[in-house]
Structure formats: C-alpha cells, structure tokens
C-alpha cells in the first residue's frame, strides 16, 4: 500500500553502480559511500541487461556489476545495520541457446526474469475462443525465442522466474 516508484537514471555502467548504492540507502561523501541507516528502496528493478559479455572481458556472474549486485543483495555485507535489497533484472534478449544469460542478470544473488508468450482468449461475441492478439494458440505459455536462457557461466540455473513478455 505504501509502494512508491523511485526512478534512477543510469546512462553508463558507473551510473548504474551509483544508482544502486543510492537506492540501497548509501550516501556518497567525499567519494566514500556510507550507509544512511535505511534503504530508499526495498526492490530495485532493472529492465535492461548486457548480452555481449566478451566486451567486458569477464564472464557474466563474475563481472563487476554482478558482484556489486550480489553484495547489495546480501544483508550486513557493507554495514552491520544494512538489511540488503532485492534486485531484479531482465534476463536479456540474447535469444535461445544454452547459456545466453548476460550481466548483471547472471548474478547468483539477483533475480532474473525471462519472457514467455501469452494468448489471452476472448470469451464473448464473434471472437469467442479466439486469441486476443491474433496469434495462434499453439505457442501459448512458451519461452519467447528472444529471451535469454541459462545456465549462467558459473552454473546457476537462470532465469529465476518467467513472466509474460510477448503475445
């Protein structure tokens, strides 16, 4: 009931780390991050992911963003009073194939979300029993072909959950 949306703009990877730290309740004073005593957000949601890990020279799950995500998700990791935050990321759009999950969604402590299909049926009138979006019913509730898949490079099964991402 008291949920609020806290938008944080991140145009490059450094902004992402600053945004996560700030949202998790840390304040930057003279380039030193200290916990303020209360997170500004309980859940941080990222609708993005980086698919092409060779550019980062590290394996997804062991890259800097994934490691920071894991640390911020762990209670008492950066301060004795720090409760941790839940960080959710899109699984990415690297498509079908084994181990296409990228970063930071390959973090072992983050929650990654993959995409499934949905064909909601119209139950009335001339369109009774027809898919709402004009698709056929054969591909209902399947993993979307563009959705990234696991396992992560460190062996974690990913994505952690699936939700409607296409019609």
Language-model-detected regions and their locations in the chain:
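Loop-rich non-cytosolic ectodomains and luminal regions
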Residues: 1-167
């Amino acid at each position: 009931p008291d949920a609020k949306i806290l938008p944080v703009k991140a145009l490059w990877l450094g902004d992402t780390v600053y945004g996560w730290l700030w949202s998790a309740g840390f304040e930057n004073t003279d380039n030193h991050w200290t916990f303020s005593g209360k997170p500004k957000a309980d859940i941080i949601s990222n609708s993005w992911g980086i698919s092409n890990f060779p550019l980062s020279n590290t394996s997804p799950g062991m890259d800097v963003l994934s490691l920071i995500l894991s640390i911020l998700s762990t209670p008492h990791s950066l301060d004795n009073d720090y409760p941790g935050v839940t960080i959710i990321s899109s699984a990415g759009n690297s498509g079908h194939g084994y181990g296409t999950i990228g970063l930071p969604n390959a973090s072992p402590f983050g929650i990654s979300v993959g995409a499934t299909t949905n064909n909601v049926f119209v139950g009335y009138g001339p369109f009774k029993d027809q898919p709402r979006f004009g698709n056929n019913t054969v591909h209902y509730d399947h993993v979307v072909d563009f959705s990234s898949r696991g396992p992560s490079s460190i062996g974690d099964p990913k994505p952690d959950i699936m939700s409607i991402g296409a019609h």
